[in-house]
Design a protein with these regions (language model features):
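A domain-level signal for the structural core that forms small-molecule/cofactor-binding pockets
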Residues: 1-164
Length: 164
């Protein structure tokens, strides 16, 4: 198969390489600890939740994107981070070749390990283009994953229900 000769394709390989390097796989450029930054002292112990974080990831099986929303919760044990840092954590760990199931667990592990949290939970709701483009039924299907650790195991009330 030969590529069509078109002026629209001039520079396309470079644009695609830049897109993959600077956006789709940019998460490899830092660690979870770097994304979270230096934690702040906290004495309140109040449950922290951040919901509806938009994200995209890349399916390692098909090299096609998936996208949706991440919901995070953690119970601090004296260390917190700003909410923007939680968004950076999601970007860091999702902008890689990673299965959604693994991403869900990695986000929980990062909160537990980097913040030494008492507990952490994550729910992800996403649409996968590998399903959409292959024409599999049912149309509009979404993958929902959940993980929890520590004091938040079994606490379904800390995160919103995933889309139906």
């Amino acid at each position: 198969m030969r590529a069509p000769a078109s002026p629209d394709l001039v520079g396309t390989p470079e644009r695609v390489a830049t897109l993959w390097r600077e956006n789709l796989l940019s998460g490899y450029g830092q660690t979870a600890a770097e994304a979270l930054g230096e934690p702040l002292a906290d004495t309140s112990g109040a449950l922290v939740t951040l919901t509806g974080i938009p994200f995209h990831g890349m399916c390692p099986h098909h090299l096609l994107p998936y996208h949706g929303r991440v919901h995070l919760a953690y119970e601090p044990a004296g260390r917190i981070v700003g909410l923007g840092r939680l968004e950076r954590l999601v970007a860091c760990l999702s902008r890689r070749l990673v299965l959604q199931e693994a991403l869900t667990g990695a986000l929980v592990s990062a909160l537990m390990d980097c913040l030494e949290a008492r507990g952490a939970a994550c729910a992800i709701d996403a649409e996968h283009l590998c399903l959409v483009l292959q024409g599999r039924e049912p149309r509009g299907a979404r993958l929902n994953t959940r993980a929890a650790a520590g004091s938040l195991v079994g606490r379904a009330d800390v995160l919103p229900p995933v889309s139906a």
